[in-house]
Design a protein with these regions (language model features):
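Accessory terminal regions of nucleic-acid processing enzymes
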Residues: 1-206
Length: 206
């Protein structure tokens, strides 16, 4: 049984939404690559949240690291351990840039509260909002994200019905009505001097 209210699951639920918003915001496309080993240090490996793969986009070839904090305040400055994580990722991927994306999502308590706040996809104060469908295959939850291009409740109802009909093996569990409270995207550059200064320690450990 999966605890869908834990902080870890919060990240699992909202990370794909963060990617959708990032792609929409920067007109790009994110590809997933799984775990990638460092060519020179096979014991080093990285699993980036994604890499920009849209060829004609200025961000092409840039890695993406996502955090969805639930309590920590977003300040635009990566914590030391996150910075180190991104440096290791860039070394394994042999990339020079990484976008550090932080998104803080809040949830409405009811559908009525969601509908009364602004229009379908924007709050009264101009923040993004939307809906996530939670479905279950009998063992674990899966999520379907209302496309950011949907702007009316009527469009949403059509999409929802089509989505549920397309997944007859899944059972609807609940809906999440969200809004994006805070978003920060900071460019982190690869620091070869730092890596070269500490890489000797890898031999001491391995």
């Amino acid at each position: 049984r999966v605890n869908i209210t834990s902080a870890m699951h919060h990240g699992h639920k909202f990370e794909p939404l963060s990617i959708l918003i990032y792609e929409n915001l920067y007109n790009t496309k994110i590809g997933e690559y799984g775990c990638i080993e460092n060519d020179d240090y096979p014991h080093l490996a990285a699993s980036p949240d994604g890499i920009n793969i849209k060829l004609d986009n200025p961000r092409y070839g840039r890695a993406l690291e996502i955090k969805n904090p639930t309590t920590r305040e977003i300040c635009g400055i990566p914590k030391k351990e996150y910075w180190v994580q991104m440096q290791m990722q860039m070394e394994c991927l042999n990339l020079d840039d990484c976008d550090f994306l932080e998104t803080a999502f809040k949830e409405y308590k009811t559908e009525d509260e969601f509908l009364k706040d602004g229009n379908f996809n924007t709050t009264k104060d101009g923040k993004r909002k939307g809906i996530i469908l939670c479905l279950n295959d009998g063992t674990k939850p899966t999520y379907e994200y209302v496309p950011l291009t949907i702007t009316t409740y009527t469009q949403y109802e059509i999409w929802r019905n089509e989505t549920i009909d397309f997944n007859p093996h899944l059972t609807w569990i609940t809906d999440t009505y969200w809004y994006l409270e805070t978003i920060s995207c900071v460019l982190v550059r690869r620091n070869k001097l730092w890596f070269n200064a500490i890489k000797h320690k890898f031999k001491e450990v391995w």
